[in-house]
């Protein structure tokens, strides 16, 4: 009986930890700073673009 209660509590704690980590990852999205990995320019901060060759946030070219 004690073992099953312990396993149940441990399972609930793990479920809470995983769901909390997933929520933090979704809500704590920052914009990509200079030389951060990116998939598109929306991932980068203002005045930076995602390099199509290297997939890093770089300064936008004035040309």
From Swiss-Prot:
Signal keyword on record: yes
One GO cellular component term noted in the UniProt record for this chain: extracellular region
Principal subcellular localization: secreted
Recorded GO MF terms: ion channel inhibitor activity; potassium channel regulator activity; sodium channel regulator activity; toxin activity
Disulphide bridges, residue numbers: 31-45, 38-50, 44-57
One Pfam family recorded for the sequence: Toxin_12
Subcellular location: Secreted
Signal peptide: 1-21
Keyword terms of this UniProt record: Disulfide bond, Ion channel impairing toxin, Knottin, Neurotoxin, Potassium channel impairing toxin, Secreted, Signal, Toxin, Voltage-gated potassium channel impairing toxin, Voltage-gated sodium channel impairing toxin
Record keyword Mitochondrion present: no
Tissue: Expressed by the venom gland.
Annotated propeptide span(s): 22-29
InterPro entries according to UniProt: Huwentoxin-1 (IPR011696), Huwentoxin_CS1 (IPR013140)
Functional note: Inhibits sodium channels Nav1.7/SCN9A and potassium channels Kv11.1/KCNH2. Also binds the voltage-sensor domain of the potassium channel KvAP (from the archaeon Aeropyrum pernix) with very slow apparent binding kinetics and affects channel gating. Reaches its target by dynamically partitioning into anionic or zwitterionic headgroup lipid membranes. May bind to the open state of KvAP.
Similarity comment: Belongs to the neurotoxin 10 (Hwtx-1) family. 63 (VsTx1) subfamily.
UniProt free text on domains: The presence of a 'disulfide through disulfide knot' structurally defines this protein as a knottin.
Additional information: Negative results: does not inhibit potassium channels Kv1.1/KCNA1 (IC(50)>200 uM), Kv1.4/KCNA4 (IC(50)>200 uM), Kv11.2/KCNH6 (IC(50)=45 uM) and Kv11.3/KCNH7 (IC(50)=55 uM) and sodium channels Nav1.1/SCN1A, Nav1.2/SCN2A, Nav1.3/SCN3A, Nav1.4/SCN4A, Nav1.5/SCN5A, Nav1.6/SCN8A.
Protein name as catalogued: Kappa-theraphotoxin-Gr3a
Native species: Grammostola rosea
